[in-house]
């Protein structure tokens, strides 16, 4: 069965979120940046806490570094297990892509990107000092992130 998500507007233009043809009120929370990188932590700490809070939806970070640990090789097993856990807990997910930048830093890029500062050059501070953040002018980095995000989007449709 194909799941449907849409916003239906009334005669005044006010929208209501519908999930599978039923109105849906998001009672949501957002996970800490790295919480979703550990299945056992999610199992023991996060899902029980979300239930205590009577949430029905969680914004779940998906870090590029966990999807493409080796360039061009995509592994969605962590995400697939998180989706399985969420379904078991009757929790809706809103997936947040952590790609090249999160809060202005390149914290969640794969190791192969972090190690190759020639191909994925860093931004510099005003005085010329090198930062650890990949430059938004680095076309190689933007293309690599876009490729990974495209695979992610196809996988999660």
Language-model segments: residues:
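Short low-polarity hydrophobic stretches
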Residues: 21, 86, 141-145
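Feature targets compositionally biased, intrinsically disordered low-complexity regions
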Residues: 12-14, 28, 103, 117, ...
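N-terminal carbohydrate-binding accessory modules
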Residues: 1-55
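The substrate-binding groove and active-site-proximal loops of carbohydrate-active enzymes
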Residues: 26-38, 61-79, 124-155
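Aromatic-lined substrate-binding rim segments of carbohydrate-active enzymes
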Residues: 42-122, 153
């Amino acid at each position: 069965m194909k799941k449907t998500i849409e916003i239906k507007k009334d005669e005044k233009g006010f929208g209501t979120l519908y999930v599978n043809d039923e109105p849906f009120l998001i009672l949501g929370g957002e996970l800490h940046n790295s919480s979703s990188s550990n299945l056992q932590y999610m199992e023991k700490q996060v899902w029980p806490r979300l239930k205590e809070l009577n949430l029905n939806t969680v914004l779940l970070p998906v870090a590029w570094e966990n999807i493409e640990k080796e360039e061009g090789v995509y592994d969605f097993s962590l995400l697939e297990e998180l989706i399985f856990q969420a379904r078991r807990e009757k929790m809706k997910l809103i997936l947040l892509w952590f790609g090249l930048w999160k809060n202005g830093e390149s914290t969640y890029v794969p190791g192969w990107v972090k190690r190759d500062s020639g191909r994925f050059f860093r931004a510099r501070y005003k005085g010329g000092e090198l930062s650890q953040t990949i430059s938004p002018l680095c076309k190689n980095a933007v293309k690599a992130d876009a490729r990974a995000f495209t695979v992610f989007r196809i996988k999660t449709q």
